[in-house]
Amino acid sequence: MAIFRQLSLGAKATLAAVTVFVSMIASRSYLAESLELRAWRWLLRLQLALFVNSLLLIGSLYIWRSTVSNLCHSPAAESTCFQLWKVVVLAFLALAHSSFFTMFFLVAEEPYLFSLAAYSCLGAYIIMLFFLFILSGMEQAYQLLAWRSGRVVGSLEKTRKLVLRPALAVGVTAVLSVAGILNAAQPPAVKTVEVPIHQLPASMNNLKIVLLSDIHLGPTVGRTKMEMFVRMVNVLEPDITVIVGDLSDSEASVLRTAVAPLGQLHSHLGAYFVTGNHEYYTSDVSNWFALLESLHVQPLHNENVKISATRAQRGGGGSGSGSEDEDWICLAGVDDIEADILHYSGHGMDLDKALEGCSPDHTIILLAHQPLAAKRALQARPDINLILSGHTHAGQIFPLNVAAYLLNPFFAGLYQVAQATFVYVSPGTAYYGIPMRLGSRAEITELILQRSP
């Protein structure tokens, strides 16, 4: 205990983050199947909120030191403006820290203003932290060069730099945050992509699939946006509409009215859904499946449908039989790989089950939320013609774009993996939490499948 008291606040925050992370791993391994579902849901969310806030506290201490503490010895430290500045910074950090807790209490048909403000501050927090690090690194490099050249940096110059660094970081953060909010507020771009498909039946040439992903209904995305997405999809007149995961961030009962516009989708050959990692974070997948089915959106729970030019028929994965029509494609969907990590009962990526009855002599299209799942699927079944994924958001905001690019085998857009194999990763139709898009653009993808010899 004495050693803990001697630790700095930053070290204590780091220790807290490690402790919460270990508890998350332990609870996933030992409590996932023994706890009642509602209790498990609350435990998982509470652990996530505490873990994120422990990490945020480390950054908050750095932001406070850079923008407030380092300026306390400046001539303006006793001014009313500086006292007001301290209140503004404190409120900004408090809002950023409260963002993840809005998942508990502030989810409804439409976003609450507080949730939008809190998540906007979280986005600005990430941008500011990045630029403070960059400017600090530049300052350290300058001081090193000055020392090596024998130049002495005066106290007045040091004071100016202490003021200049946070001023620049705040200015850049403000500009980029406003740009990101305005970008995210725009309707998603409609991107048309033509994909050559080997063995595509002649009767299904120019088949149109509209791809949605990562809508994230929850604290900052509600019914109004969902209605807009549905209208945009219907204008495209798709043959098939697919939603490749992360539709929601809360329970089905809470978001029932927000997701209701999906029932107005018009797709000649049906609308289909596969889970993303966030569906499992809600711990309410069964209720989401039932709700989507009532809206005429068919979940593909490690199963497939055989689709011809005129009809769709449930295929393998435990139900139904094959289509009698020879001119068909196999549209399969797998559970998100996060279900295995969370030990979510009855769920987990099962490619063999999903592709049961899908002949290599026919076109195979797979829905798999994460690009990592797409990579694993292609390693096991290289005969898959097209995989549709999401998850990355194309990074959503700078500088997270860099991390998303490095952590995923496929980042965004169309990839030709082999002569007859393609992967398309959607950058997302909305956004997760933070109502910003910086260095990325939300998208509704119109995929035109073209017959290839």
From Swiss-Prot:
It holds the Pfam family Metallophos. A divalent metal cation 1 binds at residues 214, 216, 246, 393. Its cofactor is a divalent metal cation. A divalent metal cation 2 binds at residues 246, 277, 391. The keyword Coiled coil does not apply. Binds 2 divalent metal cations. Its main location: membrane. SUPFAM superfamilies: Metallo-dependent phosphatases. One of its GO terms (cellular component) is membrane. The keyword Membrane applies. It is a multi-pass membrane protein. Its EC number is 3.1.-.-. It is found in: Membrane. The chain crosses the membrane at residues 7-27, 43-63, 87-107, 114-134, 162-182. Keywords: Hydrolase, Membrane, Metal-binding, Transmembrane, Transmembrane helix. One of its GO terms (molecular function) is metal ion binding. Belongs to the metallophosphoesterase superfamily. LOC643853 family. This is Transmembrane protein with metallophosphoesterase domain. The gene is TMPPE.
